[in-house]
Swiss-Prot record:
The keyword Ribosomal protein applies. GO terms for biological process: translation. Disulfide bonds: none annotated. Binds to 23S rRNA. Pfam families: Ribosomal_L23. This is Large ribosomal subunit protein uL23c. Keywords: Chloroplast, Plastid, Ribonucleoprotein, Ribosomal protein, RNA-binding, rRNA-binding. Belongs to the universal ribosomal protein uL23 family. The gene is rpl23. InterPro entries: Nucleotide-bd_a/b_plait_sf, Ribosomal_uL23-like, Ribosomal_uL23/eL15/eS24_sf. It is found in: Plastid, Chloroplast. One of its GO terms (cellular component) is ribosome. PANTHER family: 60S RIBOSOMAL PROTEIN L23A. One of its GO terms (molecular function) is rRNA binding.
Length: 94
């Protein structure tokens, strides 16, 4: 189950969203919104109010003469209840 959540996103926008109890993660492309909700509720023992997702565009990658693409991934913005937090972000204030 932890393999489905790749890593938390740490950008200026994601830190602004934490104040609104919205956390941003990169997740597996094959996950649907109900599956993402179940993964986070089981993994972090929280109540998920909403899940917003979008697919980020692929980027070109060149190695010598070969041209390929970086793997595509999905970004999920998770909205949780006001009195709950996700433990990964608890030490981000220091």
């Amino acid at each position: 189950m932890i393999d489905l959540v790749k890593y938390p996103v740490s950008t200026e926008k994601s830190y602004r969203l934490i104040e609104k109890n919205q956390y941003t993660f990169d997740v597996d492309v094959r996950l649907t919104k109900p599956q993402i909700r179940k993964v986070f509720e089981n993994l972090f023992d929280i109540k998920v109010l909403a899940v917003n997702t979008h697919l980020l565009p692929t980027k070109k990658k060149r190695l010598g003469l070969n041209l390929g693409f970086k793997t595509r991934y999905k970004r999920a913005i998770i909205t949780i209840k006001a009195n709950q937090t996700i433990p990964i972000f608890e030490n981000s204030d220091s």
